[in-house]
From Swiss-Prot:
Details of cofactor binding: Binds 1 zinc ion.
Name of protein: Endoribonuclease YbeY
Molecular function GO labels: metalloendopeptidase activity; RNA endonuclease activity; zinc ion binding
Cofactor: Zn(2+)
Gene name tied to this protein: ybeY
């Protein structure tokens, strides 16, 4: 796996994002039976100000959010609730997935609101953002149900509770 992690906000340094991201990718690979050995993916660990700029530029929403994803390929299913298309390697043998950005303050605030450790919430959001790279989405209800179920399975493999069970 070729994983690039850019830490723009020093508060992320306290969390071993390299290990966390590798653990997430392994759990996704195991759960979805995907071979991600050739995967290329980038993560930006930033602050709310940076993610608000990205959100404004790419989604025309000038507010901070927890996580943003930019898939390298459109793997989303045409039929609502269907499993996304399996990603394939390119002519160079690389499996380019895309990019994910995650904002510290929003993650910290949400974790506190949920009464969860920051690392647990960040793990969920890294899973969530990475699943977007793999064609999962939550715009349509049936797609959201599928994505949330997959997230719960992946997080369960990692020893975490289902984040959608309140």
């Amino acid at each position: 796996m070729d994983i690039d992690i850019l830490i723009e906000d020093d508060r992320w340094a306290a969390m071993d994002l390299d290990v966390l991201v590798r653990d997430v990718l392994r759990a996704i690979s195991d759960t979805l039976t995907l071979d991600l050995a050739a995967a290329e993916v980038s993560y930006l660990a930033c602050d709310d100000a940076r993610i608000a700029l990205l959100n404004a530029d790419f989604r025309e929403k000038a507010t901070a959010t927890n996580v943003l994803s930019w898939p390298a390929a459109d793997l989303a299913p045409v039929v609502a609730g269907a499993v996304p298309t399996t990603p394939t390697v390119d002519v160079t043998g690389a499996l380019t997935l895309g990019d994910v950005a995650i904002a510290y303050e929003t993650c910290e605030r949400e974790a506190a609101d949920l009464g969860k450790p920051l690392a647990e919430h960040v793990t969920h959001l890294i899973v969530h953002g990475t699943l977007h790279l793999l064609g999962y989405d939550h715009i349509r209800d049936s797609d959201a149900a599928l994505m949330q179920g997959v997230e719960a399975k992946i997080l369960g493999k990692m020893g975490f509770d289902d984040p959608y069970m309140v």
